[in-house]
Amino acid sequence: MTSPEQLACHLARARARTLRLVDFDDAELCCQYDPLMSPLVWDLAHIGQQEELWLLRGGDPGQPGLLPPAVEGLYDAFEHSRASRVELPLLSPARARSYCATVRSAALDALAALPEDGDSFVFAMVISHENQHDETMLQALNLRTGSPLLAATSALPAGRPRMAGTSVLVAGGPFVLGVDAADEPCSLDNERPAHVVDVPAFRIGRVPVTNGEWQDFIDDGGYTQSRWWSERGWQHRQRAGLTAPQFWRSGGRTRTRFGHVEDIPADEPVQHVSYFEAEAYAAWAGARLPTEVEWEKACAWDPATGSRRRYPWGTEEPTDTYANLGGQTLRPAPVGAYPAGASACGAEQMLGDVWEWTTSPLRPWPGFVPMVYERYSQPFFGGDYRVLRGGSWAVEPAILRPSFRNWDHPYRRQIFAGVRLAWDI
């Protein structure tokens, strides 16, 4: 299990990041930048409410909490849609901050009192929850119009543009998909259990698809020719009037990013594209999207040892030597920027930079057992979702691993999602 000291460090890091993302005036925190997203003050108090529920009340909503039941109910994500939250009588920013601080103080006391052989998983789950909401808040801030509020605090390494458009072979055969709690104590229920699957050989993009490659798709009429699109995807493209990735400006040479207007870097992974756009691009490129099983094999499997790697590059914890994570750069790195982070098959940038769409719907692995927070995965199995893998530049290193499964509706574009191609052989 993760040590109490490590958990305390991860809790502190997550909270410091959260507070940076709400370090604005009350008007900013209480407004809604887009109906797709919550007001930031809702996310802030929801983070505290979930921490209180799981770390101080054992997950029992019937046990009295720090907030009156009617107020606590405002932060139930299943009861109140994102679009409706701006109309709720939410805690003020000052009260939300104070509430989160009170909860955190008690949570640290609970962590300090945890027996040496105590189950620390619930702390890891809460850390994951806060970090995931931090990425959601970054999505909201990117939808905001007006002068910039955020600035990058970390520079990116140079890339190797010649890597764009190249592919690597992933050998066929069995591999271990998923993880067990014994090997990854912080893994969530939909990542478990580990089980052997057989995957035929295929090729996968060495790096994600770039903005420059996507511009070629646009210039070739990719958004105007139905032959590249699925029937549902084409219907959505027409309804939504899609002509380029979200945030690209007319003409496709500039974009907006967190309030900045800038030239579009040709060698940067494309982001803010939907699953429908991703599958259309893949068809145009004479390729396809990978399944999530293929993706995980390309990311984690080492055929030389016949075993999984903890990370694509090995066992070392994620740092900026290996991947662009942690939200400090506010953008993906150019392709080829992290050769040290390559997987055993030679695929690069599989963790960080952009989430990558797969063709897979969200399903439980055989032998799935829900974790203590049963509503994390189960309500979404079988729904209208596609799985995304790999994380983005906005994901905290503490929660990302090759087995981590994200999911969203196939039409979503505000997420930091891009594309990696695959080919049959």
From Swiss-Prot:
Species of provenance: Mycobacterium tuberculosis (strain ATCC 25618 / H37Rv)
Record-listed E.C. numbers: 1.14.99.50
Molecular function in Gene Ontology: ferrous iron binding; gamma-glutamyl hercynylcysteine sulfoxide synthase activity; oxidoreductase activity
Keyword Iron: yes
Gene: egtB
Pathway assignment: Amino-acid biosynthesis; ergothioneine biosynthesis
Binding positions for Fe cation per the UniProt entry: H46, H129, H133
InterPro entries with a match to the protein in the record: CTDL_fold, DinB-like, DinB/YfiT-like, EgtB, EgtB_Actinobacteria, Sulfatase_Mod_Factor_Kinase, SUMF_dom, SUMF_sf
UniProt keyword annotation of Hydrolase present: no
Needed cofactors: Fe(2+)
Function: Catalyzes the oxidative sulfurization of hercynine (N-alpha,N-alpha,N-alpha-trimethyl-L-histidine) into hercynyl-gamma-L-glutamyl-L-cysteine sulfoxide, a step in the biosynthesis pathway of ergothioneine. Ergothioneine is an antioxidant that protects mycobacteria from oxidative stress.
Family: Belongs to the EgtB family.
GO BP term, pick one: ergothioneine biosynthesis from histidine via gamma-glutamyl-hercynylcysteine sulfoxide
Protein's name in the database: Hercynine oxygenase
Subunit comment: Monomer.
Keywords, sorted A to Z: Iron, Metal-binding, Monooxygenase, Oxidoreductase
Binding site for gamma-L-glutamyl-L-cysteine: R82, A83, S84, R85, D408, R412
Catalytic activity: gamma-L-glutamyl-L-cysteine + hercynine + O2 = gamma-L-glutamyl-hercynylcysteine S-oxide + H2O
Origin: domain of life: Bacteria
